[in-house]
Amino acid sequence: MNDRLTPELVLSAYCQGCFPMADPETGEISFYEPDPRALIPLDDRFHIPHGLKRALNKKPFELRMDTAFPEVVHACARTDQPEEQWIDGQIEEAYGKLHEMGFAHSVECWDEEGLQGGLYGVALGKAFFGESMFHRKTDASKIALVALVQYLRAHRFLFLDTQWTTPHLLKFGTYEVPAKEYRKLLKRALEEQ
């Protein structure tokens, strides 16, 4: 692992509002602090699209947490678009160590054929930083996201940070806050246990 990307450095970066990504071409690790920052609401503004509600009612997957963390990260790293491969071996190793330390977590969707989708991220205080998601079967990553939101609500988290807004995440009510406001929210979330 690159000496620069220790678990302690990654945690310190999160506490300052930054997160690491590997350059898909060079493998160089850089830290980012988007302005504005995208958050998924954990209150009644969280929206489950109608079609997904139908899928949830069918209960197509068994939901698990932290039973296949390395597999989830590795699946998130595999993408058909090389320009989007920001998760490299250094990232996988650092987050694996964060998982062993109790900071990084996965939400997984399983069926009789195995792991079909999931997501992973980092929990610090009452903040959760969503990193990436994947699916092998329809709606698996979305169902994992809904399960994560339910978990975060039950444990009184203040926010779910998705870093940037995407069309996919907008369907769930994602909103943006200026970096200055984000840092205030982050400070409050880190002070709460």
Swiss-Prot record:
This protein's superkingdom?
Bacteria
Q: Does the keyword Cytoplasm apply?
A: yes
Report the Pfam families cross-referenced here: Leu_Phe_trans
What SUPFAM superfamilies does the entry give?
A: Acyl-CoA N-acyltransferases (Nat)
For this chain, one GO molecular function annotation is:
leucyl-tRNA--protein transferase activity
Supply the EC number(s). 2.3.2.6
Localisation: Cytoplasm
Q: Which UniProt keywords apply?
A: Acyltransferase, Cytoplasm, Transferase
User: One GO BP annotation here?
Assistant: protein catabolic process
Catalytic reaction equation(s) = N-terminal L-lysyl-[protein] + L-leucyl-tRNA(Leu) = N-terminal L-leucyl-L-lysyl-[protein] + tRNA(Leu) + H(+); N-terminal L-arginyl-[protein] + L-leucyl-tRNA(Leu) = N-terminal L-leucyl-L-arginyl-[protein] + tRNA(Leu) + H(+); L-phenylalanyl-tRNA(Phe) + an N-terminal L-alpha-aminoacyl-[protein] = an N-terminal L-phenylalanyl-L-alpha-aminoacyl-[protein] + tRNA(Phe)
EC category: transferase
Q: Does the keyword Magnesium apply?
A: no
InterPro entries cross-referenced by the UniProt entry: Acyl_CoA_acyltransferase, Leu/Phe-tRNA_Trfase, Leu/Phe-tRNA_Trfase_C
A single GO cellular-component term from the record reads: cytoplasm
**Record function comment:** Functions in the N-end rule pathway of protein degradation where it conjugates Leu, Phe and, less efficiently, Met from aminoacyl-tRNAs to the N-termini of proteins containing an N-terminal arginine or lysine.
Q: Which HAMAP family match?
A: Leu_Phe_trans (MF_00688)
Q: Which family does it belong to?
A: Belongs to the L/F-transferase family.
Q: What is this protein called?
A: Leucyl/phenylalanyl-tRNA--protein transferase
